[in-house]
A protein has these predicted regions:
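C-terminal motif of bacterial Sec signal peptides marking the signal peptidase cleavage site
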Residues: 14-18
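A Zn2+-metalloprotease active-site environment signal
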Residues: 2-6, 19-300
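Internal catalytic-core helix/loop-beta-alpha segment
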Residues: 9
Length: 300
């Protein structure tokens, strides 16, 4: 019976893989098999992103909000340039970048497929400056570019619905079964499908790619080591949400140091007047700012 089950599951896997597509992760070159299309993933994630943003409270700190959007856009521009220069411009249609800062004391940030990024105010005292924030955002952007959510959904889909899909294939069922299965699986996993639960391999890959993206955008990648050291000191005996599925602190820092020579090849501090913020270390604002202008009276 056990042998029969192994044979059946092997057949299921073969059929599912045959129905999927093989893609290459940018920068790392890792091969991955995806059983779901970009359209299917975006359809599921967009709905859950809208639901989250309807209940979330946007930050009232105008300075920090502007910083998150500025750093995020610099990174998005760097990613777009990289993809275009490497013959991957078709991928750009999958990203409509949005960068949000929300009122939440958790030390966390996440990115949904399609480039919907949320940063919690609680992580800013740890990032301390724009360069470290770029490391965080680069990591989250990397999850989207590497299609980690689609990869995870493919694995969950294969594990939970393999036998059912095999039956559907044998009976000549249409595509609707797959669509219904995806919707059901997405509902079961909820927002966690897009914002947590990545494998250690995926987290390390996001560290690697994020480091490169930050350097491409003009941020010093060397700040990554001190940032992750601060994160490890913060967690103590209770890992922060942001670190719950990540490699150990020692492993992460060792890996980052190993990737540093590669990252530094891409690093060119911004020199133009229009991008002076990307190469500098700017402190995080701890005060709520107002958009109202102050009026001054000149002394006669």
């Amino acid at each position: 019976m056990k042998t029969i089950r192994i044979v059946v599951m092997s057949l299921v896997t073969a059929i599912l893989v045959g129905c999927g597509t093989t893609s290459t992760v940018p920068i790392t070159g890792r091969k991955q098999t995806l059983l779901v299309s970009d359209g299917e993933v975006l359809s599921l994630s967009t709905q859950q992103y809208k639901q989250y943003m309807q209940s979330a409270k946007a930050s009232t700190n105008a300075t920090n909000t502007a910083m998150v959007k500025r750093v995020g856009q610099n990174l998005a521009n760097a990613v777009s340039t990289y993809l275009t220069n490497n013959g991957l411009s078709a991928e750009l249609q999958n990203y409509q970048w949005e960068f949000n800062l929300v009122q939440d004391n958790q030390v966390n940030a996440w990115c949904m497929p399609g480039g919907k990024i949320v940063v919690y105010e609680g992580i800013l005292p740890i990032t301390k400056d724009e360069a470290s924030l770029a490391i965080v955002l680069g990591h989250e952007i990397a999850h989207a570019v590497a299609k980690h959510s689609a990869e995870r959904l493919s694995n969950e889909y294969k594990n939970q619905y393999g036998t059912a899909i095999l039956g559907a294939v044998v009976q000549g069922a249409g595509v609707s079964e797959k669509t219904q299965a995806l919707i059901s699986l997405g509902q079961q996993l909820g927002g966690a499908l897009w914002t947590s639960g990545f494998s250690r391999k995926q987290e390390s890959e996001a560290d690697h790619m994020g480091l490169i993206f930050a350097a491409m955008a003009g941020y010093d990648p060397q700040v990554a080591v001190s940032f992750w050291q601060r994160m490890s000191q913060l967690s103590g005996n209770k890992p922060a949400e942001f670190l719950s599925d990540h490699p150990s602190d020692a492993t992460r820092i060792r890996q980052i140091q190993g990737w540093m020579p590669e990252a530094l090849k891409y690093y060119k501090p911004a020199k133009s007047a229009t991008m002076t913020t990307t190469g500098k270390t700017l402190k995080i604002s701890s005060k709520k700012t107002s958009t109202k202008k102050k009026t001054t009276t000149k002394k006669k």
